[in-house]
Structures are given as C-alpha cells and as structure tokens.
C-alpha cells in the first residue's frame, strides 16, 4: 500500500469498507481514528450510519455500490460521497435533488474502462459528453472511479482513468 501511495504522489485516502460489519466493529474503527468509510448498500447504511454521523461529525461516508434510482433520495441525504454515478437517468435525478435541497454530495462517475457488458458504468467513449452534461446540471463531479476487469492489469485501467480525468479537468 505504501509503495502505491508513494507512486501516486498525491494525497491518498484509504476507505474502510464497513459492509457486513456489526455496529460495535464500526464504532471501534471510528474510535481508533478511522474516519472515512464505504458502504455498498443504501439500506444497510441507513440501518447503521445515521447515529454514527450524528455522534462523530468527522466521519465521512462513501457509497461504493450501485445506486438504484428509488434509493437516490435516501443516499443523497446520508452519503457525503457517491462514487457510482453511472447513467443519465441517475444524473438527472441527482440534479433535481441538488436543486431541491440546495447542496450536492461529492460525486464520482463510475467508468466501465474494461467495457464489460456485465458491469455498469459510463463507457469511455461516452464519458466526455456525460461529464459535460453533469456539469451543466450543477452536479459536483469530484472524481472518476472504475473497477478493472479481474483478468487485466489494474494499472492500465487506472492510467486510462487518470488521462480521462485530466482531459476533463477534474481536480480531486
């Protein structure tokens, strides 16, 4: 991990994944100084995180799993970062919530860099237009994310992601 952090040369943040962990384990992690957590299911997060966020104001919560449109309002209210913006319908819904609420959580666009049909995410060829559309709706696009194919070198996909981020002037 240290070698990768040094290689990246930027601020690197480790996100503790708390899915399927009991409340006691999460609280122990918080008391140990971990303050950035990821959950992949809105419903599980709703059962776990409201009291933690109320009692520990330095905690930051990321949604790292797919976001169904019927859970968007709940996710919008609970999560500080939504890392899985992956389609125009969801972008439109989040834009409406942004207008309604007067704020927008930090958003990462999920890019399907491997162009795998079984995975969600914006295809690389569609990304530039998708970013412009999101920005025109006043969505706060703070980053890109991908899940590289299992049988390919992850560094190639992260390199591609970085080029797309630079090309679109996304600073995170």
PLM regions and their residue ranges:
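Conserved alpha/beta-domain cores
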Residues: 1-172
């Amino acid at each position: 991990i240290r070698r990768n952090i040094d290689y990246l040369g930027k601020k690197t943040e480790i996100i503790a994944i708390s899915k399927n962990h009991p409340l006691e384990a999460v609280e122990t992690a918080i008391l140990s100084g971990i303050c950035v957590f990821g959950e992949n299911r809105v419903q599980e997060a709703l059962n776990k995180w409201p009291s933690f966020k109320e009692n520990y104001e330095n905690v930051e919560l990321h949604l790292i799993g797919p976001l169904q449109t019927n859970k968007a309002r709940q996710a919008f209210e609970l999560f500080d970062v939504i890392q899985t913006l992956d389609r125009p319908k969801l972008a439109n819904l989040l834009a409406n919530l942004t207008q309604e609420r007067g704020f927008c959580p930090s958003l990462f666009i999920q890019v399907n860099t491997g162009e795998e049909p079984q995975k969600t995410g914006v295809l690389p060829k569609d990304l530039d237009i998708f970013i412009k559309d999101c920005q025109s709706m006043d969505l706060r696009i703070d980053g890109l994310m991908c899940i590289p194919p299992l049988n390919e070198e992850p560094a190639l996909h992260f390199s591609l992601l970085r080029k797309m981020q630079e090309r679109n002037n996304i600073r995170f």
